[in-house]
Amino acid sequence: MTVRREVKAIGLVSGGLDSTLAVALLKRQGVLVKAVNFYTGFCITETQRRKGGRPDGTVPRNEALRAAADLEVEIEYVDISDAGYLDMLVHPRYGYGANANPCVDCRIFMMARAKEIMEREGADFVFTGEVLGQRPKSQRRDTLRIIERESGLDGRLLRPLSAKLLPPTIPEREGVVDRERLLDISGRSRLRQIALAKEWGILDYPQPAGGCCYLTDESFGRKFFDILGQREELGEERRIAREDVVLLSTGRHFRLSPRAKLIVGRTEVENAILEGFAEGRARLEVRGVLGAVALVEGEPTWEARVLAARILARYGKGKDAARVEVEWREGDLVETYAVEPERDEGRIEALRI
């Protein structure tokens, strides 16, 4: 009697409905699945978790870890928010989507890392929950092929939910995965996925929705390109550093001048985060009253310093005072500015990034 060898696959799992179904589908074929969840630094829910919770006080769960536990599969959590990933963000070969999202390059980067894990684990292939035509940039037929080829996974990247609509992969051709038991889902509708989840007893999953990545957010995208523009203005290298990733998702951002930017904390947690990044920046705080902490980056003129102090004074208990004192601390330099809080909302909004 011929004994079927164990088939092992590496699955990219976000915890969303599609990747959960992809794992369940292959498990039903007897495939040993190891899940992988990549942390890029730009996941909104994970950033909120690390900052202590959402604005309403609730703390989001890690859906990938939850899904792996529910499906009883091993999961590896991989931090890819390193210099290589950040360099890709600034110089994407295939460009950006509507905002600062280099979706195709990001998927190539992830799949290349998944390939390394596949080889290390001795697995047969990599799979994802991607659905043909669901996303306008990264899930077109041509871009799915580009991602497979450029990541080095030619023939070994399976999309189980849309497999019947795509060319057979090596595991399908070799018979280690039964192509007839894979699916032919396409498009943006989730009705088939929801029906399958109900049929298979998968009841706990986040509601299908976009917007989990900061890079797809219009406001974040403005801040992303704004900081690159400031660095070019200052004659610096066009780059994004790890600390920028944190700061871009923290506080209110204002463009004081082409060479200087203000960040104002919105909560106690954000104030504490800004305190941690004060080195190399100017730190501002209103004296004698409760209020926000702020940082100024770049090379502010005297006028920009006063403007920063006035805007900061607007966000605190002293906003209705005739004048307040704002402390400017930059290295060994400590100055105090007596300013009137900025009251022109139109001007504030015009400066907001």
Which stretches of residues belong to each language-model region?
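AMP-forming adenylation/ATP pyrophosphatase catalytic core
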Residues: 156-353
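ATP-dependent adenylation/nucleotidyltransferase module used to activate substrates
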Residues: 1-199, 333, 342-343, 347, ...
